[in-house]
């Protein structure tokens, strides 16, 4: 698409010329810019970002939706140093860091958040519409660009087929064969993927994405049966066999199969829970131009295809498929899903989060 071509062309020309001297005024105008037009075009944004020279990201594991390659590609392309803090942090950790480091040069410039945490912190975000904003479905973005969904997937169960039988449903996980083997990716009151796991359990047990009481009850039963592990799973625990069953997004579970050949991904049919993560700019970003250039890169064809390469479903997939710019091989390799996905609304997520905050610890501890 034209945007991607423009980014590449401008990056090449600015790499051969010195950054603008007036970095102070550039930073000031970038902090209030709501689109690239406010800065006089993409070339001005690139120059301002290169003058800042740095971008602070947080809670982006290298193996999560291909963020390792995404960060490297962005840094190499624009000559900007990307500081990646707390790669294994939760969405709430991102917000906590922004609050604790406010006014400091190492505060997060951008956020990548689970929907429940994002909804509770909209006041911290700076509105910005990327050049490809029109390609993003209306229900997956704030009209002003205060937050925008970026990539998504479906909640799944990953399991080591060499250590446990293949589950046919969530109910199977309550069986003795899974004793001490099931892990949830994080604390659902803080982490988006764990929150999705509870919502999936609610759907599978007669609840809804809003009424998640049955999901909380399910994990309480898992805990009582001795099947739920008090361990946050990652690649190391999966490969070592410490966490042979993991609730997580399908793109994360599927990526583990490249390192452990016996690792399989199961998306329960009939209870398909879909969710997108949320991209936003910290309104107090110490590098406001770099933060906005990062957004332009992520929502370009190049950035979207890099997410797709990591098994995630980019938010512009439909528009890119129509335009013929999507990576067809990576798109065809996505895990197959049966049934109509349920994608929670803001209100449903807020109500579910409220119930979870009041009841999770009592049920699971």
Segments (PLM) and residue ranges:
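Sec-dependent bacterial lipoprotein signal peptides
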Residues: 1-14
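Bacterial lipoprotein signal-peptidase II cleavage site
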Residues: 12-29
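Extracytoplasmic "Venus flytrap"
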Residues: 24-42, 50-69, 277
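Extracytoplasmic ligand-binding site segments that recognize negatively charged/polar headgroups
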Residues: 56-71, 83-99, 105-242
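A ligand-binding cleft/hinge motif common to bilobed small-molecule-binding domains
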Residues: 116-122, 239, 244-262
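Periplasmic-binding protein-like
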Residues: 152-156, 216-221, 227, 260-285, ...
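Mature extracytoplasmic/periplasmic domains
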Residues: 273, 277, 281-341
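Extracellular/periplasmic bilobal clamshell ligand-binding domains
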Residues: 323-365
């Amino acid at each position: 698409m034209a945007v991607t071509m423009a980014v590449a062309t401008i990056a090449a020309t600015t790499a051969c010329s010195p950054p603008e001297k007036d970095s102070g005024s550039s930073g000031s105008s970038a902090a209030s810019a709501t689109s690239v037009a406010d800065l006089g075009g993409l070339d001005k944004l690139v120059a301002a970002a290169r003058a800042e020279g740095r971008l602070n990201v947080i809670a982006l594991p290298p193996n999560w939706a291909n963020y390792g390659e995404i960060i490297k590609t962005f840094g190499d392309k624009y000559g900007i140093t990307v500081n990646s803090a707390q790669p294994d942090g939760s969405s709430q950790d991102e917000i906590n860091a922004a609050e604790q480091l406010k006014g400091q040069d190492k505060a997060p410039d951008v956020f990548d958040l689970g929907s429940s945490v994002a909804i509770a912190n909209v006041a911290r975000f700076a509105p910005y519409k990327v050049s490809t904003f029109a390609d993003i479905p209306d229900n997956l973005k704030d009209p002003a660009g205060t937050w925008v969904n970026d990539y998504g997937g479906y909640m799944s169960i990953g399991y080591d087929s060499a250590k446990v039988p293949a589950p046919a449903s969530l109910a199977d996980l309550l069986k003795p064969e899974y004793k001490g083997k099931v892990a949830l990716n994080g604390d659902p009151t803080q982490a988006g993927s764990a929150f999705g796991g509870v919502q999936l359990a609610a759907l599978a047990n007669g609840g809804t994405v809003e009424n998640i009481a049955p999901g909380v009850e399910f994990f309480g039963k898992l805990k009582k049966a001795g099947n739920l592990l008090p361990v946050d799973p990652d690649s190391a625990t999966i490969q070592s066999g410490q966490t042979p069953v993991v609730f997580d997004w399908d793109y994360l579970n599927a990526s583990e199969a490249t390192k452990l050949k016996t690792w399989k991904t199961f998306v329960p049919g009939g209870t398909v829970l879909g969710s997108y993560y949320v991209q936003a700019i910290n309104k107090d970003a110490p590098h406001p131009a770099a933060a906005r250039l990062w957004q332009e890169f992520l929502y370009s064809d190049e950035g979207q295809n890099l997410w797709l390469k990591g098994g995630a479903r980019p938010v512009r997939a439909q528009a890119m498929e129509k335009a013929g710019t999507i990576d067809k091989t990576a798109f065809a390799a996505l895990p197959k899903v049966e049934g109509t996905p349920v994608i929670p609304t803001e209100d449903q997520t807020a109500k579910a989060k409220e119930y979870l905050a009041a009841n999770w610890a009592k049920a699971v501890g």
